[in-house]
Curated annotation (Swiss-Prot):
Keywords: Isomerase, Membrane, Transmembrane, Transmembrane helix. Ascofuranone is a specific inhibitor of trypanosome alternative oxidase (TAO), and quickly kills African trypanosomes in vitro and cures infected mice. As an essential factor for trypanosome survival, TAO is a promising drug target due to the absence of alternative oxidases in the mammalian host. It comes from Acremonium egyptiacum. It is found in: Membrane. Induction: Expression is induced on AF medium. Its main location: membrane. It is an enzyme of class 5 (isomerase). Disruption phenotype: Still produces ascofuranone but impairs the production of ascochlorin and leads to the accumulation of ilicicolin A epoxide. It is a multi-pass membrane protein. PANTHER family: PTHR42038, TERPENE CYCLASE AUSL. Pathway: Secondary metabolite biosynthesis; terpenoid biosynthesis. This is Terpene cyclase ascF. GO terms for molecular function: isomerase activity; lyase activity. InterPro entries: PaxB-like (IPR039020).
Length: 273
């Protein structure tokens, strides 16, 4: 959302090329991540994006693609992400019951819960952008209206915060790597690190008066926790992969899962009692 903003003369001419290159790298990396999550979910009969994080990301893409962004690359990327989200959503609805057998109320109502979460998150994103733009938040002398770059920063940062923290929590709770892989982690980690954090860090370094919010206490907390969780995720993934079991149908289960649990999953899958 900053592609149309022209920096003042004192800002290095490298500002826009580096800013756009890092942003586009993030877009490509996250597109690859979504594709791999969809593929791995089908292959392992699981899903790799936490339920609330997926609902929030889908709602964000929908609201911003349809109503907020005007740059062609951003609009195209968000539309593509929405389309790629479809098989991920399918994986949750088809295989999520296997991951939620410990919570029957959730497993029986996954569809309703997902639809409700998407609606809730869409309302939140719509309210945020409507309030920000309507009140011209972040307005500066060199801007007409609200600072859309800052608005996008807070919205995207919270999306990534949820994905990073919840993905780590999901991996720890499951104890298996169903729906995820090394390439999924790497593309997600680098997409966020370079496409978001380094992107705005460069903007802050070269044009600090317009991007001082990047080093504010809330922002440092958000991108700091996001980065730490993404790094820790790699170590946890290694531990989980070293100890999990793969079943004959491609599903993965925690090393400590007993035969009764595995049998329960098979019954839930086939619908047998």
């Amino acid at each position: 959302m900053a592609f149309g903003v022209e920096p003042p003369e004192h800002v290095t001419p490298w500002f826009k090329p580096v800013y756009e290159a890092t942003f586009q790298f993030g877009g490509v990396a996250w597109t690859l991540c979504y594709i791999l999550i969809a593929r791995e979910g089908m292959r392992t009969k699981s899903y790799g994006m936490p339920l609330f994080a997926l609902a929030n990301n889908f709602a964000w893409e929908m609201v911003y693609a349809l109503w907020v962004v005007d740059n062609a690359f951003e609009k195209t990327a968000m539309t593509i992400w929405m389309l790629i989200d479809t098989p991920i959503i399918y994986s949750i609805l088809k295989h999520g019951v296997l991951e939620w057998q410990h919570a029957p109320m959730v497993s029986r109502n996954l569809k309703s819960i997902l639809v409700g979460l998407i609606a809730l998150c869409a309302a939140a994103h719509w309210s945020w952008q409507s309030w920000w733009i309507g009140n011209e938040m972040g307005k500066r002398d060199d801007l007409e209206g609200a600072d859309l770059t800052q608005m996008a920063y807070w919205a995207v940062s919270m999306c990534q915060f949820l994905v990073s923290t919840m993905s780590l929590a999901m991996l720890c709770v499951r104890g298996h790597s169903g729906g995820v892989s090394w390439m999924i982690w790497l593309s997600r980690f680098l997409g966020t690190l370079i496409g978001l954090n380094m992107n705005y860090a460069w903007a802050y370094y070269t044009w600090p008066e317009a991007h001082e919010y990047f080093m504010s206490a809330p922002a440092v907390f958000v991108w700091g926790v996001t980065t730490v969780c993404d790094i820790i995720y790699g170590f946890v993934l290694y531990h989980v992969k070293s100890n999990e079991r793969e079943l004959s149908d491609g599903r993965k289960v925690a090393a400590e899962a007993d035969d009764e649990q595995v049998g329960g999953w098979s019954k839930m899958k086939t619908g047998k009692n």
